[in-house]
A protein has these predicted regions:
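Short, solvent-exposed loop/linker segments at the N-terminal edge
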Residues: 271-276, 361-367
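Short flexible loop/turn segments that cap and initiate beta-strands
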Residues: 285-303, 344, 376-407
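Aromatic sugar-binding surface patches on proteins
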Residues: 308-320, 407-425
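Extracellular Ig-like/FN3 beta-sandwich strand-entry sites
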Residues: 325-329, 366, 431-433
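Edge beta-strands of extracellular beta-sandwich domains
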Residues: 339-350, 442-450
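Low-complexity, Pro/Ser/Thr- and charge-rich linker/hinge segments at domain boundaries
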Residues: 346-364
Length: 450
């Protein structure tokens, strides 16, 4: 069934078998393939005529696909949508019987036509974690995953307080949502109308034995789907990494849960208005507690909790403090058994002074260079928006720039980029010297050699 006027449904009858077969044959020897999905949020989950219907050609294709008499009697009790699901699964198994088959379903009811087909080896829910407790009864013996999850909304470097208020944007999917900033909170406290926060979904995955895992929507921001905004927003807010490749804060929540290496991530920055009430969060692992200091004065030690206490900004996944801002420095210290595990200090940044260039990633041909506007002591200036101009020598070539801003209309191929919350990224191909210049800042320079 078509979702849009010019989508793949126009070609399905003629091309689906060849395209699906070619997909399996192309990728079946890749060890990274865990399972095959035969659909994502397809309209065939439902029988409602409100969402279009199968064409006569599609129905004939399935009902006359070589079933013998004994099979037709059994299949005749199923809907055309269920038979189509079986047909697609048969194509997959024809070329690869070693991997299970699933589908991303945003209809969690067991009456879903895809589920009714019996062709899915793994039940996949897109969102709807409130239905998870019923999975063992509704799908006995079937493995289960979140085939798509979370859809939290975040802009790197932007924070909406109080942080324990959860914002749903829009409140319902059909309602408009407006905010003059066109930004979303980088605390894990904002999500779309159909979804949840990162912590909320991960809590279900972590504590439900029969949930096999989750696919987070999304790892990276991407062009398009700028929920909850319209123009001038032109890229998504869903990623735990922004479009330029910079991690958002929630990236470190997963790091704290999924890695054994000790880590500590304190946020946000420490450049606010005098007397402003600020919520500070910390993600950590391999420690019992984290203590916060403001200009050397302890604000108390916090530890993760499993039961919500209204007086504390703490959960099972982060700790927090509500404090009054004063310029200087904040320091977090994580401890285990009374011994320090990790420390992190954030200082109030002064006037933007120079451009710092560091190699973020170096591949076979390209180098990703992180560009930061810093004060004279090297502290990131979190509100900096300077326009930065790039030049290279040697055989080097600038092939891309970005800053992670969802509303930026700057050309991705242009040799300049405006800093966004103090940062941007430039991608260089080849060897040479990269220079970054801005009228009010000391030039940054980096020699790239591979």
């Amino acid at each position: 069934r078509k979702k849009t006027q010019n989508d793949y449904a126009r070609f399905f009858d003629e091309w689906h078998e060849r395209d699906l077969s070619d997909l399996i044959l192309r990728d079946r020897n890749h060890p990274s393939i865990l399972m095959w999905s035969i659909g994502n949020e397809v309209l065939e989950q439902w029988s409602s005529a409100e969402a279009d219907t199968l064409t006569l050609e599609q129905a004939n294709l399935i009902l006359n696909a070589g079933h013998d008499a004994s099979t037709l009697a059994k299949d005749g009790e199923l809907s055309v949508q269920s038979l189509l699901t079986q047909h697609l699964a048969e194509i997959v198994r024809r070329y690869d019987s070693s991997r299970p088959i699933t589908a991303g379903c945003n209809e969690p009811n067991p009456g879903n036509h895809l589920f009714k087909s019996g062709a899915l080896d793994i039940i996949g829910f897109n969102y709807h974690h409130e239905w998870v407790p019923g999975v063992p009864q509704n799908f006995p013996g079937k493995p289960f995953i979140f085939s798509e999850s979370v859809s939290a909304l975040q802009t790197r470097g932007y924070y909406m307080m109080p942080s324990d208020t959860v914002y749903k944007a829009p409140k319902e999917w059909w309602l408009p949502y407006t905010d003059p900033t066109y930004m979303c909170s980088a605390y894990d406290n904002m999500h779309a109308s159909w979804s949840s926060t990162h912590e909320e979904t991960w809590d279900v995955v972590k504590h439900t034995p029969y949930v096999g895992g989750q696919y987070i929507w999304t790892g990276f921001d991407y062009i398009g789907e700028p929920t909850p905004y319209g123009f001038p927003a032109r890229s998504s807010y869903f990623g735990i990494i922004d479009l330029a490749g910079f991690p958002k804060d929630t990236y470190y929540m997963y790091q704290s849960e999924w890695t054994a290496k000790p880590m500590l991530h304190l946020f946000p920055h420490w450049n606010w208005l005098p007397g402003q009430t600020i919520d500070l969060w910390a993600y950590y692992n391999q420690a019992d507690e984290v203590e916060l200091f403001i200009n050397g004065k302890s604000q108390g030690a916090r530890r993760k909790i499993t039961q919500k206490e209204p007086s504390l900004l703490c959960t099972e996944y982060h700790v927090g403090w509500r404090v009054m801002y004063e310029p200087g420095e904040v320091k977090a210290v994580s401890r285990k058994g009374g011994k320090t595990v990790c420390e992190q200090t954030i200082k109030t940044a002064g006037t933007p002074h120079h451009i710092r260039l560091t190699t973020d990633y170096q591949g076979k041909e390209t180098t990703f260079v992180a560009v930061e506007v810093v004060d004279q002591d090297g502290n990131l200036c979190p509100w900096a928006e300077d326009q930065i101009f790039f030049t290279v020598d040697g055989d080097a070539e600038i092939i891309g720039t970005d800053n992670g801003c969802q509303t930026s209309m700057e050309n991705f191929k242009a040799p300049q980029r405006k800093a966004f919350f103090g940062k941007c990224m430039v991608v260089v191909k080849g060897n040479g010297t990269l220079k970054a210049q801005s009228p009010m800042l000391k030039t940054g320079e980096l020699r790239i050699k591979r």
